Structure formats: C-alpha cells, structure tokens
Amino acid sequence: MTSLDSFKCKKTLKVGAKTYVYYSLPTAEKNGLKGISKLPYSMKVLLENLLRNEDGRSVKKADIVAVSKWLRKKSLEHEIAFRPARVLMQDFTGVPAVVDLAAMRNAMQKLGGDAEKINPLVPVDLVIDHSVIVNFFGDNKAFAKNVTEEYKQNQERYEFLKWGQAAFSNFSVVPPGTGICHQVNLEYLSQTVWTKKEKMTVGKKTGTFEVAYPDSLVGTDSHTTMVNGLAVLGWGVGGIEAEACMLGQPLSMLLPNVVGFKLKGAMKEGVTATDLVLTVTQMLRKLGVVGKFVEFFGPGLDHLSVADKATIANMAPEYGATCGFFPVDAAAIDYLKTSGRAAPRVALVQAYAKAQGLFRTAKSADPVFTETLTLDLADVVPSMAGPKRPEGRIALPSVAEGFSVALANEYKKTEEPAKRFAVEGKKYEIGHGDVVIAAITSCTNTSNPSVLIGAGLLARNAAAKGLKAKPWVKTSLAPGSQVVAAYLADSGLQAHLDKVGFNLVGFGCTTCIGNSGPLPEEISKSINDNGIVAAAVLSGNRNFEGRVSPDVQANYLASPPLVVAHALAGSVTKNLAVEPLGEGKDGKPVYLKDIWPTSKEINAFMKKFVTASIFKKKYADVFKGDTNWRKIKTVESETYRWNMSSTYVQNPPYFEGMKKEPEPVTDIVEARILAMFGDKITTDHISPAGSIKLTSPAGKYLSEHQVRPADFNQYGTRRGNHEVMMRGTFANIRIKNFMLKGADGNIPEGGLTKHWPDGEQMSIYDAAMKYQQEQVPLVVFAGAEYGNGSSRDWAAKGTRLLGVRAVICQSFERIHRSNLVGMGVLPLTFEEGTSWSSLGLKGDEKVTLRGLVGDLKPRQKLTAEIVSGDGSLQRVSLLCRIDTLDELDYYRNGGILHYVLRKLAA
C-alpha cells in the first residue's frame, strides 16, 4: 500500500551501499505538523505508522493532524488505526488462534468465498513455550525427561501447528525447547527497524523500493511489552484481535495518554533490575496507568542496560500500562551488536533513528508528556513482591514480617503460626511460610544476564560454604533461551547451580505460568492435611492466587539470586537481611551478605561469556527443532481435516449458521445474573491455565471421552477445544462468587453459582447450560480491575459461549475489555461510586438493558433496569465501554472475526 503522503515526507536514506525509502518525521514537521519533534518517542512511532499508512480510508489526514493536536493538549480522545509490522504468538494462545483461522477457512467456503483469503498478510511467529511442565527436577536428567513428557502430552497440538505452518504463508513456528517467545523476540526476532519491499513512485522513479520503518508488533501474550526495552513498540492483544491484524485489519485504538517516568541517578551495589521493576510496578499501580503508554526518560537511562530496560518493559501488564517504552540509544545499538544482529541492520537502526529524531542521548530534550513521575534509582532497595499481587512490593528485611501479617489477616492462621508438621517418610518437618517451590523462571529475568550470572555466583559461593537447597524445596531453572544455558555452562556457573539444586528443567515459561508440576506427594499431602500456608519464590512476573501451584497459597516474586537464597533458607519467615541462611560446613552461620556477588564480578563474567558468537550459534537453526519435532508428520491441505474424536482440537461453533449480512443486535431483556465477583478478578480466574480437576465440568467431559486423569494435561493445552474451555470458564479453584455468601460471611471457592428462580447451587457451567435451555440471557457483575492479567482471549470466548451478553463492573483492564467486544459481549461500567454491592444486589435479580438496537454510539450512557426478587425496581446508569467506531462494527457483527470474515467474503 502506497501512502497518500499528504505531508510530502517520503524521502530516501542511504546506509552503506543500500538506499531505503522512509517517511521523515522532521520533514513532516516542516510541512505542517508543527512541534512533533517534542512528542514522546512512542508517539513518534505511532505518528510514523499513520504517515506511512495514510490511505484516506482507515488513516485520514485528520488522524495524522490529531497527533499534533495531542501535543498541544497532552491528551486527545481520537481514534486511530495502527498497523503493526508483525504478530507474535505463544502456543497456549496461538493454537486457538490457528484453530480460528482454520475454522474461518471452512466458513469462507460455506459463504462461497476463497479459503486462501484467510492467510496472514504480515509476518507471524509462534513460539512454543507454554507446554513444558516441571514434572522432573533436581538432577541432570530432568531436562530430557520433561521434554519427553511434553511431546507425549502435546503430540496432537504440535501436529496441528505443523499443519498451520505448511498451510498458511507468512507463518513460522519456533519449536519446543528453544525458549520463551518474548526472550526469543528480544534476542532474535526483533530488528528495531523493519524493512519491506513495496512498489511505489519516489521522485520521478517508479519501481520496487525497500521501505524502512520502526519495528512494531502485537502479541497474543500480555508480556509482549518486553521488547519495548529495545525500542520496539508492542503490546499484548487477544488472539481474536491478533487474527484480525494478521488478516489485514488495522488495530483500532484511541490516541493514548503518555505518562513520562523520569529515572535519575544509579542503582546502589547489591540492587538488581528485579528490585527496580517491582518498585516501578508498585508506583505505577498506585498512580493508575491502565490504557496509557508509559515512557521512560531522564539521566537514569544511561545507567541501565537493554536487559534491565526489558525487565521493566516486561511487567507493563502488572503496572497496568499498555506499554513501557524506552527509546533507541547507544545501549540499544550495543545490544543489537552483542546479540548477533547483522552489521548492516545495526547500521540501519542507528542511521534511521538519528534521521527520525528517535535516537536518545544524554543531551536530548525531554519530550512532552501527559503527566510525569520521578524515581531516583539510588532509592531502590532489595525487594520481593507478595504474597499474591505483583504490585505488593516489600523491602527484603520486611518480607518475614509481611508474611506473618498475611498469615493472620489473609489466611486466618492465628493459632500456633510457628508449628511444624511431619512429612510422611521424611526426617524433616514443614510449616507455614516454608518455601516448597523456588524457581528461576520467566523471560522477565532470564533475559537479563546480570541476574542470572548473579544467581550462579551466589550458588558458587553458597556451595563453597557447604549450603544447598532445603530438602522440601522443589528447585528449578528454566531459562528463556538456549543462550542462557550456553553462557552458564561456558562460565562453569551451571555446575554450581546444580550443586545447590538448580538443574536445568526446560526452556519455557514453566512455573511463571503455573507449569510448576506436582510437588512430591508426601509434601503435598502434609500441606493439604494440615492446612499449611506454603510459599513459592519465583523470578516471574505474576503471583496471583492459585496460579503457581494448587498446593501453594503465598507466592513471592524475586530476583534469581534471591530465589536461590530462599531455597537455601527454606522459608519466607526468615529475615534474610539479618538472619543466617543456614550453617556452613565449618559449623558457622552463613549470611546472605557473605555470599552475595559484587557487581564488578558479575560484569566481568558478562563481558567474558555473554558474546555475539553464542547468540549467532544458538539462533542459527531456530526454526529447525530437535529430533522429536522433526519426526512429527502432518498432512498438507488447504483446510484442516478435523478429527471429531479429538479432545485437543475441534472446529469451534463461532461461525455456525453465519450469513453474509449480520443479524440485528437485540436489547438484553430480563437477563439473569450468572455470577457476582469482587475486585481484581484476573483472566486466570475467568479462564484458568493450570490443572484440570477430575470433579470439575471439564474433568467430567474428558472422562466421558475416555481420557485418563493422568492425561488431562492442563487448560492451557486444551484451548483448541471449545468444549473443554467452556466448562473451564469461571472454574478457577480460588474464584469467589458473592452470590453464594453465607450468613457467616464466608464464600465458597471455585466455579459455583445459584440458578434462579429455584436458587439451586451448581457449577457455573451447568447453570449457564440450564439458562440456555430456558432461553434466558445472562450478565456478569464484578468490581474494579476486572480481567487484569494475561491477554487470554478464552476469558472472553468462554464468557460468550456460556451465553453472557454483558459484563457490568467498576472498571476493566484494557485487553480483556477489547476481547469482550471482539467476541460480541457488551462491556459496561458503573458510574463512579456505584457498584453491585452499593446497589444491594443479591443475585436473584433480573436485568434489562435497552438502547442497543439502532443508534448505539461508542461510550454511550445506557440505563439498566434491575428488578429484585421481591419485585422492586432500580434504574442504574452505565457507561458503554465500546470505545471506538470500529469496535461498534465488531459488536454489531457478533465479533471481530465475523466482521473480518464478512469483509473478505464480500
């Protein structure tokens, strides 16, 4: 597509022997877009995207002008169409996305169209990283055993992905055992400046030119934001939005407010990037940045590596922002070189960024932001976050005290908090606060050599003093790329990590996403028999309830060195700032300060062992896979041959009976309430990723289809089968439905509800199916921050398939709100100060929403009529959170995929 180029900014840039076409921001400023050089760097990337894609339809001149107007007001509610350069997926979200594409090919044929039109138009990379589970640990055979188990459990899914790789163009699969998608993206896939050949006229010459532009992406995982640390603008979206982008649909969004986060000073000795990101997360959650861009600026950036920046950018979902952006600077150029990017690409990035005013130096003027806040890096202290929120940062000396308070207040364990309990067949006892999982895991930290080498050096020092992990601790090391394993092995540090218990268990997300695997049976039994509040310490990004392990209630985020330290100590009830980790082989107490490595030593190891040659070697055959992958056979065909007996991959029902013209939207009349939830309901609560209980609706379904409980696998691997996922919706073991609140104030946990008007208690799935038989529409009520966490489109898909027409809450997290719209579910918010609780709702009410027929507008005020069981009526004002005109089109079509399919079939 050739831009209309209203601001005459199409120019050429010569880099070495090559000439590139680009859309010059400085030229656009001279030609009418006054002051745009003062924009935040992230907004400049959005502006370039609009200039390059101006077509008079999805991108008009007025949209481009709106960005300069934003500058004057520092905020502007204006809808734009953003076209990312590419799409990134992981397998938990990628499998259902490919299922949707396969189903769309079938639906396209039924509508009389060409199935080949359902094909990615931009590059799509799917990295298989979510399926490996830590079933084995603690020895050098653990890795191979876990790989064998992974292929055994996921053969059918992997065959399907191999079919997709062959059937769709522009679609590549990075096989299992390679790494975590965001780390592979940072270390290999991302280019910072992207190029594409296009036919166009430049000056008087018409032909094919190579166009250079900022690398950008959306991903089907919320931590796609990590790559903003390398100045690549990107964020997580639901799979359905990603599919629409793949098929040529621009991403509809409002111009964001941009919060400037000024960093000054430098971190003190012994402080890590993990401590910094937990501090940033706490500060930004307190400020409130949902739906906003955060951009980091200030002199402190000169003291951060790209790996440090990537750690901060990674946790944008945890602080609530759309992204946390860092501009191109000298550190970015150094990282591109160190990570083995081709020299011509590195030269292009440097030249392009400087030509566009996208290159930050110490002398660069501060951009104009909507608002700002400041952090002196010298104020950051060693920290952890827990026991159940990423923003719950606690300074290291206060962790033990914080757990003690939580034990009494959160977990209601007030009697004998220090009591120890026997473990069958073992000589040790365990108690509250004992660390039963210590995991070096997650791209958040394993992408950062400083904390990995720090952990290795700490392990070396601990082993030298005779320390090792306590026997009740399940230890694991799962790096985000093979590069990490290489430099740990080459440096000799892996051998020391092995000595204290941290053997390699796999390359993938593992414990961070709940794939921690089962605890040893005797430990699990002791925990559950005695009601022990056990702890996990992990170098991940999320510690929500029920996420890490069903046996663990208290979860703490920490740097890799602190993960090792807590494995040695064996408990979060010790103040590691002053109490010993244990007793050395000389009989003397060993303190954390005795074994903590210096930054000088860490940097020396990094300089010697983290080299471009390792990156080049490990990524040379990134798409090839191991022998297990290469053995997988698949049938090449335009449309997928669905196996009706499969419990992993099924043709979803979204397009059944679909016509070329959408059915008119109807009002919601006398809907029943399916569930009433509190604040901070995560997408994990709505659609869990972990283990499937035998007694759950999903477990019963699998049993009925002759699947043994040992082969249930987990919800995340079953996302290609709507029958399992519908039954798993709202089935998290920790979710609480306030409709079931007893007279004593207690609320049972798990996916339960009451069916009305009979008041019978049953599973949420069973109630939803009963309502469907009765042809009764449904709504869900919730509190604040509904749908935070993972970009899990099944949280919206499952909601829709249960028959829910609307979700009414105090506030939504960004991705889940757009996912609901993308599935044709109406998101609504209460006015400030109103909640279902303040209205006195009990759950037996009927809800009517009118005004959906005809002239519905984005962000329109609507009125709900709520009739209680006693016949009393309340009228409640609600805000329609369909935010843009494009979203309104999606809603009227029954969802974004229906909209795109009709458009392609026309």
UniProtKB/Swiss-Prot annotation:
Pathway involvement of the protein, from the record: Carbohydrate metabolism; tricarboxylic acid cycle; isocitrate from oxaloacetate: step 2/2; Organic acid metabolism; propanoate degradation
Record bears the keyword NAD: no
Induction cue: Higher under aerobic conditions than under anaerobic conditions.
UniProt keyword terms in alphabetical order: 4Fe-4S, Iron, Iron-sulfur, Lyase, Metal-binding, RNA-binding, Tricarboxylic acid cycle
Source organism, top-level taxon: Bacteria
InterPro entries: AcnA_IRP_Swivel, Acnase/IPM_dHydase_lsu_aba_1/3, Acoase/IPM_deHydtase_lsu_aba, Aconitase/3IPM_dehydase_swvl, Aconitase/IRP2, Aconitase_4Fe-4S_BS, Aconitase_4Fe-4S_dom, AconitaseA/IPMdHydase_ssu_swvl
Reaction(s) the record says it catalyses: citrate = D-threo-isocitrate; (2S,3R)-3-hydroxybutane-1,2,3-tricarboxylate = 2-methyl-cis-aconitate + H2O
Listed GO MF terms: 2-methylisocitrate dehydratase activity; 4 iron, 4 sulfur cluster binding; aconitate hydratase activity; iron-responsive element binding; metal ion binding; mRNA 3'-UTR binding; mRNA binding
Cofactor (UniProt): [4Fe-4S] cluster
Top EC class for this record: lyase
Cofactor binding summary note: Binds 1 [4Fe-4S] cluster per subunit.
SUPFAM superfamilies in UniProt: Aconitase iron-sulfur domain (SSF53732), LeuD/IlvD-like (SSF52016)
Any one GO cellular component localisation term in the record: cytosol
Gene disruption phenotype: Cells lacking this gene grow more slowly, but also reach a lower cell density than the wild-type. The ability of the mutant to establish an effective root nodule symbiosis with soybean plants is not affected.
Similarity comment: family membership: Belongs to the aconitase/IPM isomerase family.
Its job: Involved in the catabolism of short chain fatty acids (SCFA) via the tricarboxylic acid (TCA)(acetyl degradation route) and probably via the 2-methylcitrate cycle I (propionate degradation route). Catalyzes the reversible isomerization of citrate to isocitrate via cis-aconitate. Could catalyze the hydration of 2-methyl-cis-aconitate to yield (2R,3S)-2-methylisocitrate. The apo form of AcnA functions as a RNA-binding regulatory protein.
Subunit-level organization: Monomer.
Name of the protein in question: Aconitate hydratase A
Organism: Bradyrhizobium diazoefficiens (strain JCM 10833 / BCRC 13528 / IAM 13628 / NBRC 14792 / USDA 110)
Lineage summary: Bacteria, Pseudomonadati, Pseudomonadota, Alphaproteobacteria, Hyphomicrobiales
